[in-house]
């Protein structure tokens, strides 16, 4: 009998991508996050689909429709909690996935990396428009503050902001279009993820040592499907613990109040996964400067491969670069904390110092560390 898995046109693609794919024999648990992100995306699309059946994108009924989902729809509370906390899990996996890419030099696969950065931006846009939909206080004011940043663009800014709003302020038209965006963007994310995988399979996976693994490859199934299954078990465990025992711990209490344009919350802040970028935005007193710094904080990932100066790909055997990498990680955690604090001393100065250090580490210190390590590895005799 002919093996259908290897001959059928459609099954053949799946086989080459997930079953008979040659994978390096030494990839660690840090390589689990790609599959975890795929599962997170499927969870978000499925839970979002069921939420969309009951949600109404109208300013008068949006808030009560979310309350109706939680109170009256069968397992609506569970679907909503899985969707809200699934987004947090998605971003946790995303940040770890990007961190792994920086640590092990995966950015040198430039097509895969650049598509990945576009994916990150698309997922961030999806999460932002999704956060607006429950039409609570923080949803409304978050949308107002972030979309208002467009008005900082010279000459066309105000027109652009009003075009996005569909009026002179965030209102019914904004909510309706944000719901449309939130529905379509995940499918664009799926398409980009397929392109991301396509480019990855052109080169094959990187590995912790950073050297060419072609001489030692093993089939993806069963070795890495089993390994990914363990990661999945942990993902589901954490997600279910969050969704069932502490569903609102990562949300904002202000979002339990319906949106009120006449009452501004004392501290406007986005979800936790945007706080690092929000802290960088707030650390610059000038509006346009803040917007540019916010964009630069993410888009800097596109030029990271131009800043690679080391002769070795991975940081596994580069202690100076390793130290700077973990300082960068601590710095991002500090920025996340600062983003959630009020705009007052000492938080202002800490945020400004952390923002400066973020750009200094990536643009100056890490390339210099690479050059220093090259020099130290040269034979001196």
UniProtKB/Swiss-Prot annotation:
Domain of life according to the entry: Eukaryota
Magnesium listed as a keyword: no
Cofactor(s) for this UniProt protein: heme b
Membrane topology: Multi-pass membrane protein
Cofactor mode of binding and number, as noted: Binds 2 heme b groups non-covalently.
Residues the record lists as binding heme b b566: 97, 196
GO biological process annotation, one example: mitochondrial electron transport, ubiquinol to cytochrome c
PANTHER family: CYTOCHROME B
Subunit annotation: The cytochrome bc1 complex contains 11 subunits: 3 respiratory subunits (MT-CYB, CYC1 and UQCRFS1), 2 core proteins (UQCRC1 and UQCRC2) and 6 low-molecular weight proteins (UQCRH/QCR6, UQCRB/QCR7, UQCRQ/QCR8, UQCR10/QCR9, UQCR11/QCR10 and a cleavage product of UQCRFS1). This cytochrome bc1 complex then forms a dimer.
Further comment: Heme 1 (or BL or b562) is low-potential and absorbs at about 562 nm, and heme 2 (or BH or b566) is high-potential and absorbs at about 566 nm.
Protein name: Cytochrome b
